[in-house]
Design a protein with these regions (language model features):
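Active-site-adjacent substrate/metal-binding segments within catalytic domains
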Residues: 196-355, 375-401, 406-407, 447, ...
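Substrate-binding cleft of secreted/luminal carbohydrate-active enzymes
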Residues: 406-410, 414-416, 531, 546-602, ...
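Aromatic-rich peripheral "rim/lid" segments of glycoside hydrolase catalytic domains that contact
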Residues: 428-438, 577-628
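Glycoside hydrolase catalytic-domain groove-lining segments
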Residues: 448-463, 467-544, 559, 563
Length: 628
């Protein structure tokens, strides 16, 4: 079946002052004062657009499908009082994902989207149009969506539009970065932040992870491994983290030669707590000044973001402690998470200085961000191109600086790349791409060429890395499960990596799936490198696909997950995503539609979710107990 002609309408909060409708090439842009900006763009065909009073006329000039599909994305912030309407039927955008992702489906003539302030954009369509209102969180995509199907025989049609401005304006966030909704632990006064300092010190001390282990006869070495297990299991002391197998169990071994299970926390230095305020500054009750101690709340390490991306979490640390320093904040949080049994930083830490200062193991990711990628294969470079290979080698020169660091566990190659697209994408490239020329010269089918491509890709990286750093581990690409479930990819990667990493989000562990990946990679150990559960109603932020009723239930879900991981015998670590809740108005690099979930162990006001921490502490005690 042919693809539908897709016209994308992207909705973003607060991008303009005064309603405006205009064209940008083949795009139609509706800019609303605070409700958003809608962009209509033909993606798989061409249309001629013309303006009329309160309307846009469409004429299809090139159709590559048998129907026209329009998709209107609505960002997650609309759970804060936003509403949808199709003709006379209407409803709220739900706070939590329901059993049915379809909020509406049926024929109609008119749709509307209304934000929390009452600003409303109404769009009218031809007779016979079919609509779906969809909750994309069903597929881990943090948006709502209008799907609009125009009858196939309609080649010319008119879309009408109207806009109703708000009467008054509500704020999306208070001065502490909190949404208007009530939730447990919400603060109303700066004095509460200052009072938290003493009470939280007492709470973290009460977790007493090391003391509880000691009462069980277990002592940790300086790296967090279980003292004495090296002698017990005959593990080697190499001065660096490495992997060994004894019997049917794989061990991550710390530099002192003891068994170590990687209990990591991702985004340790923050990042997802930043939000982009550009064009919607008036949606916030307060934004930090750019001078004085609050200047540290802005992302000042990158000039582009220095006046755009801000963290209310960091501003709250200024209120709470008097100042904010990136390294010192990370050192403080290392001491905290150690009390719950976490023993290392996960991916996206960006605070290796703090790790060294606190003697805390960490992982890193290769700096491949500036390397040219194949556009139709997300995150994957062309390994046949000599200049690209040279760029990869130059990027890996940076690993020499940490080659002798015993705290560094190893490197992730990248994150959630689309290797499954190789067979489709390479034949569609033009001959300017070296990979396309290599495919043509091979005379192989696209499916058969995938193995050649992957072998080249992994060989380039492994050879360059091992020559520069022989001491640390190659920890895989942080595959999504849909990517990992591929025999060819697993087999080739297994020849070059030390461990496989899977960003494995799941309510229940599919043991057959992870065992299949293990077998296909030739028996490589695994790190489940990204997962979390949310309790949206007991937090400042929204619910994730895997949402539970309470913070206590989050801790219980964590416990079930890590218990399953340890029981596999070949899983040597897990990484919870993230340390700090994502910004309620969307993490900065994704704009206003960015992820905004209850990911954190800490809220925007630096308050620990105490029931979660206690549950995690209890689960981590059991994990370490399996190593003795």
């Amino acid at each position: 079946m042919k693809k539908a002609l897709a016209i994308s309408l992207a909705l973003a909060l607060g991008a303009a002052f005064g309603f405006e409708a205009k064209f940008e090439g083949e795009k139609v842009v509706f800019a609303c004062p605070a409700a958003g900006t809608f962009r209509l763009e033909c993606q798989t065909g061409k249309v001629k657009l013309s303006a009329a009073e309160g309307a846009v006329d469409f004429a299809v000039t090139e159709a590559k499908s048998n129907q026209m599909l329009l998709s209107m994305l609505v960002p997650p912030s609309f759970i804060q009082g936003g509403a949808w309407r199709v003709d006379a039927q209407e409803g709220a955008f739900p706070f939590a994902l329901g059993l049915d992702e379809k909020l509406f489906k049926g024929n109609g003539r008119e749709i509307a989207v209304k934000d929390v302030n009452g600003e409303t954009l109404v769009l009218g369509f031809p007779v016979g149009t079919y609509f779906e209102v969809q909750d994309n969180r069903k597929w881990n995509w943090n948006t709502f969506e209008y799907r609009i199907f125009i009858p196939a025989e309609t080649k010319e049609w008119r879309m009408t539009y109207s806009f109703t401005p708000a009467q008054g304006r509500k704020k999306l966030m208070d001065k502490f970065g909190q949404t208007p909704r009530d939730f447990p632990g919400k603060i109303s006064d700066e004095a509460e932040l200052k009072a938290d300092v003493a009470s939280e010190k007492a709470f973290y001390r009460s977790l007493d992870f090391a003391g509880r282990l000691a009462r069980k006869g277990i002592r940790l070495d300086a790296f967090g491994g279980v003292a004495g297990t090296g002698r017990k299991f005959g593990l080697k002391k190499t001065g660096f983290f490495h992997l060994e197998k004894r019997g049917e169990r794989h061990y991550l071994v710390d530099p002192a030669g003891n068994a170590f299970f990687h209990l990591g926390v991702c985004v340790f230095g923050g990042g997802d707590d930043l939000t982009d305020v550009t064009g919607r500054e008036d949606a916030f009750e307060w934004l930090p000044p750019h001078e004085g101690p609050f200047a540290a709340a802005w992302k000042t390490d990158e000039p582009y973001w220095s006046t755009r991306a801000v963290s209310h979490y960091r501003a709250n640390l200024v209120r709470k402690f008097g100042s904010y320093d990136h390294t010192e904040a990370a050192v403080r949080n290392i001491a905290r998470v150690r009390q719950a049994g976490f023993n290392s930083m996960g991916a996206f830490g960006e605070v290796s200085a703090a790790a060294r200062k606190a003697f805390f193991p960490y992982v890193r990711q290769f700096p491949f961000w500036g390397i040219k990628k194949i556009p139709s294969i997300r995150g994957v470079f062309d390994p046949y191109d000599a200049e690209t290979v040279k760029s990869v080698e130059q990027a890996l020169d940076s690993v020499r600086a940490d080659a002798d660091d015993p705290l560094l566990i190893g490197y992730f190659l990248d994150n959630e790349q689309a290797f499954e697209a190789i067979a489709r994408a390479v034949p569609e490239l033009d001959d300017s791409w070296a990979a396309k020329r290599a495919f043509t010269a091979s005379g192989k089918t696209a499916e058969a060429f995938v193995e050649d491509f992957l072998e080249k890709y992994y060989s380039v990286i492994e050879k360059a890395f091992r020559a520069r750093d022989p001491n640390h581990l190659l920890l895989g690409n942080r595959w999504m499960p849909s990517t990992a479930d591929n025999e060819t990819l697993c087999r080739v990667a297994g020849r070059h990596l030390d461990a496989i990493s899977i960003n494995y989000y799941a309510r229940e562990i599919d043991r057959a799936f992870v065992q299949r990946v293990y077998a296909r990679t030739g028996g490589l150990p695994q790190i489940w490198s990204e997962f979390f559960y949310s309790a949206g109603r007991e937090s400042n932020v929204g619910p994730f696909t895997f949402d539970v009723p309470t913070q206590r239930a989050r801790g219980e879900a964590y416990g079930r997950y890590v218990k399953a991981a340890v029981s596999m015998g070949f899983v040597v670590g897990v990484e919870w995503f993230t340390l700090i809740d994502q910004a309620a108005t969307g993490r900065f690099f994704q704009g206003v539609g960015g992820e905004s979930y209850n990911t954190g162990l800490l809220s925007v006001t630096d308050r620990p979710y105490r029931d979660l921490w206690t549950g995690m502490r209890d689960a981590n005690l059991k994990v370490i107990g399996t190593l003795k």
